Amino acid sequence: MSRWVEYERKRGIKDITIRLWSRQFNKICRNANRLGYYVPEYEWGEWNIKDKPNRYLNDEEEPRILKELDPSSVQDLKHNNGRQAARDIFILMINAGFRINEASVLKWSEINFDNGVIYLYRSKVSNDDFIPMTKRLCATLLNRRKSVEGEYVFPGRFGGYKTIQNNRALESAFSRAEVTGVSSHNQRKTFATRLLIRGAAITDVQHLLGHASVKTTEKAYAAFVKNERFKQTIDLLDKPVQPKLKVVN
């Protein structure tokens, strides 16, 4: 397996993709063994996937991306609609923590505007969740509802729902906005870090992200939480000292 990993790295395959492939291979072998097929023993070897540092959008980058997703900047109707869809899906992901595939298959029937929530089935962990909507997200989806017909919030040109087009549109906007080192998944990370920096409980963030275990959330965001805690601690030095004892005459 270690030789295979090195081969894929030389081909330019990213570590995160290799990790997904290796997990899928391991899952197939386990299922085959469970069904009674003979699966020879194999060794994974010594190899490590290099985790990237947690990257999230800052307060300057988000407006630049939204500017590049402004549909009024293009005249062609087809591109205008496509850019509007990309803008709406960007707002959905950064305000609700959706994965790109979850956002792409969202149906109008799964949105309850009266209660301000989105009902979501997360196929990755096989559970049902509901995500409260921010005012910004609710307004975005209500406005989209006026012009989009059919079952899906982000329909494809020939029916069904959009898939890879959403990802390409977002990556193109990142490039035009000169925001580097990000993908569509970083909106989800931005959603989580903004909650944590405002004091949200890690278990609440876990459920909103749809992680099966809080350990997954802690592993992904532990460094961020620690760094923010250190910053808040150092900020105490900039505050005037408050006397703890009252002077009694």
Model features per residue range: what roles?
Residues 1-30, 37, 72-82, 159-165, ...:
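N-terminal core-binding DNA-recognition domain of tyrosine site-specific recombinases/integrases
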Residues 16, 34, 88-91, 95-102, ...:
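C-terminal catalytic core of tyrosine-transesterase DNA break-rejoin enzymes
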Residues 19, 34-100, 104, 124-126, ...:
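Basic, Lys/Arg- and aromatic-enriched nucleic-acid-binding interface segment
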Residues 46-47, 78-79, 96, 101, ...:
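Basic, Lys/Arg-rich DNA-contacting stretches centered on the C-terminal catalytic core
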Residues 56, 122-126, 209-234:
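Catalytic-site neighborhood detector that most strongly recognizes the C-terminal catalytic loop/helix
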Residues 67, 71, 143, 156-158, ...:
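C-terminal secondary-structure termini that scaffold catalytic or DNA-interacting sites
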Residues 134-180:
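Active-site/catalytic core of tyrosine-dependent DNA strand-transfer enzymes
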